[in-house]
């Protein structure tokens, strides 16, 4: 004897009564919201959450509502709105079909990052109990594809620590699709290879702040341009007249140039490919503003930054990781150090701290901060 087929019960009403019936069923808690309604000529069928008794079906029939059971394999289920639910559903379907067991036995990612159509899950994902036979399965890539789709992407990769190389290259394990990404963030288009370019989504508030500065008429030097985290906001939103972007990772240079062209600002950008200790030397006296966005410290470029400023002075945006209780002292020491570098290099500036931005927690008790330091020449050096 064959096993009974599981069914879903549908309540059928004339189409013109659909809105009223939908509201009534939903209000009574009878509407099965994980299943799509059905349409049949002049009728609409609403899925029900439970089996109705003969007497209940008879009562509904007297009101013109006819209830029929339909094989659940033929109905269409709604895609879950919550991405966590969509991910769990995709995993369960693959596990049950290919392994004959539930995905509840394994730990699934609870957070992820999306760069365009690439979904990045944290380091260590898919390594715990129950994942060995999944990774070795000849249909594993179908699971990775389903998971990427469930999270709104088309590619899936696992993050890894930043490589210990000169370029601080990202490391990731690509499970499905391509590592090349294109996306728009805060009105700026980016395109680069995420396997070769570091991207920090956590600095979004600082990128927005820098983009909100009025840079019209200014020439800016970005000492650590990367793929354009700050260069592009300064050009697109800040309206900088020109940005000199210093970067030595070839993949970042490629991504920066491509992204600048996408945003139509490549005509106001000069990319200096190479070590900024050398490239910034060629920009002496040209900048109204220098951005120093390297963590954990940008100190190695401070002297070159002071030299880049025009004789009329300007601004330095100094990034640093600092222990919370030492921030005030760090600001004072940094200003003193910048003034010392000015004197040492024959630049008659007087630096003052104008603003300190606490960007985010980098580690317990350690903050990523940005000091906005203003450089002014002494009064007797100003030409009227």
What does each model-found stretch correspond to?
Residues 1-384:
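SAM-dependent transferase fold signal centered on methyltransferase-like domains
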């Amino acid at each position: 004897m064959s096993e009974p087929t599981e069914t879903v019960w549908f309540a059928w009403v004339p189409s013109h009564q659909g809105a009223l019936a939908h509201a009534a069923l939903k209000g009574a808690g009878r509407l099965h919201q994980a299943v799509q309604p059905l349409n049949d000529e002049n009728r609409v069928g609403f899925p029900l959450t439970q089996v109705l008794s003969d007497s209940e079906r008879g009562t509904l029939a007297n009101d013109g509502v006819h209830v029929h059971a339909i094989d659940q394999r033929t109905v269409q289920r709604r895609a879950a709105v919550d991405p966590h639910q969509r991910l769990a559903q995709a995993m369960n379907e693959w596990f049950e079909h290919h392994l004959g067991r539930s995905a509840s036995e394994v730990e699934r990612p609870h957070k992820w990052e999306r760069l365009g159509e690439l979904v990045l899950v944290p380091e260590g994902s898919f390594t715990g109990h129950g994942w060995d036979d999944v990774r070795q399965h000849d249909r594993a890539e179908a699971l990775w594809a389903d998971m990427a789709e469930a999270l709104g992407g088309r590619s899936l990769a696992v993050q890894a620590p930043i490589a210990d190389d000169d370029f601080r290259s990202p490391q990731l394990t690509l499970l499905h699709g391509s590592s090349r990404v294109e996306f728009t963030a805060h009105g700026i288009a980016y395109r680069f290879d995420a396997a070769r370019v570091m991207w920090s989504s956590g600095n979004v508030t600082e990128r927005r702040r820098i983009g909100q500065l009025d840079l019209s008429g200014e020439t800016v030097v970005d000492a650590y341009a990367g793929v354009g985290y700050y260069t592009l906001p300064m050009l697109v939103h800040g309206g900088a007249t020109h940005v000199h972007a210093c970067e030595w990772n070839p993949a970042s240079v490629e991504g920066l140039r491509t992204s600048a062209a996408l945003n139509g600002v490549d005509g106001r950008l000069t990319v200096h490919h190479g070590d900024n200790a050398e490239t910034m030397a060629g920009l002496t006296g040209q900048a109204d503003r220098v951005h120093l966005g390297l963590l954990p410290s940008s100190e190695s470029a401070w002297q070159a930054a002071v030299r880049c400023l025009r004789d009329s002075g300007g601004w330095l945006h100094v990034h640093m990781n600092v222990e919370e209780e030492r921030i005030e002292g760090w600001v004072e020491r940094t200003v003193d150090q910048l003034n010392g570098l000015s004197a040492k290099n024959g630049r008659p500036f007087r630096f003052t701290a104008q603003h300190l931005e606490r960007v985010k927690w980098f580690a317990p008790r350690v903050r990523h901060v940005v000091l906005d330091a203003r450089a002014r020449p002494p009064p007797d050096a100003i030409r009227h």
